[in-house]
């Protein structure tokens, strides 16, 4: 029997796949538990429409991320911190502080976990911080730390 998987089934198929499986397995397990539906013409057309919708949504997200990247790479995030001799900070600047300042000053909301800051900034000056906006798009944000 040909079925369309609605959920991932380990060892059998992934969501959205169309596969031939044994009739008993399809009726007694997959269809009964909601893991799959029988592959009729109506179900196949629904699946193709759903895939087109998902592809369109993914393309929109990618375009949005690219536009945000263009905007972010022109910005400089200004932060002030107390520092000692040689430009070393008392404490550090974290991705959370960068995200909050970016939202407050420029109105761009970015999750702090998207910032690829290996360790906190502990010195005055300019630092380039990579920000992962999409799995294909990474922007580089310029962070300037000056003395308070």
From Swiss-Prot:
HAMAP family: Ribosomal_bL9 (MF_00503). Binds to the 23S rRNA. GO terms for biological process: translation. It comes from the Bacteria. InterPro entries: Ribosomal_bL9, Ribosomal_bL9/RNase_H1_N, Ribosomal_bL9_bac/chp, Ribosomal_bL9_C, Ribosomal_bL9_C_sf, Ribosomal_bL9_N, Ribosomal_bL9_N_sf. PROSITE patterns: RIBOSOMAL_L9. One of its GO terms (molecular function) is structural constituent of ribosome. The keyword Transmembrane helix does not apply. This is Large ribosomal subunit protein bL9. Keywords: Ribonucleoprotein, Ribosomal protein, RNA-binding, rRNA-binding. Belongs to the bacterial ribosomal protein bL9 family. Pfam families: Ribosomal_L9_C, Ribosomal_L9_N. Disulfide bonds: none annotated. It comes from Listeria innocua serovar 6a (strain ATCC BAA-680 / CLIP 11262). GO terms for cellular component: ribonucleoprotein complex; ribosome. Gene3D superfamilies: Ribosomal protein L9, C-terminal domain, Ribosomal protein L9, N-terminal domain.
